[in-house]
Amino acid sequence: MNIELDPKTVHIVNDTDSLKDCIEKLRCSKEVAVDTESDSLFVYYEKVCLIQISADGQSYVIDPLETGDLSELNDIFSSPEILKIFHAAEYDLMCLKRDFGFEFENLFDTMIAARMLGRKEIGLGPLLENEFGIHLDKRYQKANWGVRPLSREMLQYAVSDTRFLSQLKEKLSAELKERGMEDMAQEDFERLCRIHPAPSEPHDCFWWKVNGGVDLTPAEQGALQGLCEFREGEAKVRDLPPFKILSNSAMVNIVLENPSNEGTLRRLKGVGSAVVRRYGRTILEINKSWRRKKRIPQPVLQTRPANGILSRRERLKTWRKNMGLEMDVPSDVILPRDVLETIAEVGPRNDAELEILMKDLPARYHRFGKKILEISLNESE
């Protein structure tokens, strides 16, 4: 479904005056639906390129690249009086916090709600299709949102992602209430508000982060590390994502095949003529010289937890899995992974200790705490 760019209902915000008007109207709203578009597939340092907000039948497409200072938007995002509706909010929040320092309070995530209700298809498109028969055109999902001017079709796409979020929230919220899961959902929404910003340095460049790296010989790992560092530096200089310089699979193929000339290098899968023309000699030299390196970065080895911790973790996981099957929801809806790991590691000995560990999850503590403590103490399997 394409949303027409009717100037009566769709407002392009690209200067201080239109931003001021937008914020004044949003201050009067009880809830706003929010989405963002970024350019992570096209640059080294990604950035938020659009912020879309729908409220009270109006949609605002805010252009951070042209508008300038967006700090007053924080009054909307941090207001406990205005509900912010997102779908799959985690990435949006991390990027908005990184780029603008926004804070968030009073949030509803339709993807989290759908998971908690046991929906099997939780993408926004399938949810709208299944719940309301609304079809979203997703062809611009991976578009370069950093280009200007944006086409009319891209703007229509941007508006469509927030246009129906309030309607979806109403339906999912009613179901959560009916199933008595509102309190658990609210816990997850509040935890989401406290998520950390995305890192300002976005990429790791270590050989063990590359799929297949741990299976290589030490010499091959050295060569792979050299290629990782070269790729990272070149990506920064050219302002491109590292994979557009050289893919992970191409780097592994290079170190495994150990080519001695550009002709052999060119024939490797994932390399090709364009890479060889630009980087051929450099790649061959790195592949050769880094094999002889005596020291390269190494991963920090994790100490094996004590047997008691491992046993407690497995008991908790088994209980969580069975409870998820019983309630027809993913297991981490029952108990988030990070909290499970903390409980397994600490091993609470009484209600008070467990309540402290689950301080951000009071609803789950009251619902499942007694059983969790039994399992932690190994009083019941």
Segments predicted by a language model, with ranges:
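Non-catalytic, usually N-terminal nucleic-acid engagement modules in DNA/RNA processing proteins
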Residues: 33, 42, 50-53
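Helix N-cap/beta->alpha junction signal
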Residues: 15, 88-89, 247, 336
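Flexible glycine-rich surface loops and low-complexity tracts that mediate binding to linear polymers
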Residues: 36, 87-88, 354
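Short beta-turn/strand-loop junction motif enriched in small, turn-promoting residues
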Residues: 37-39, 113, 270
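Active-site-proximal helix-loop-helix substrate-binding element of RNase H-like nuclease domains
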Residues: 4-5, 52, 57-72, 76-166, ...
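Accessory DNA-binding and partner-docking regions appended to nucleic-acid-acting proteins
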Residues: 152, 172-381
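N-terminal accessory regions of nucleic-acid-interacting proteins
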Residues: 1-32, 36
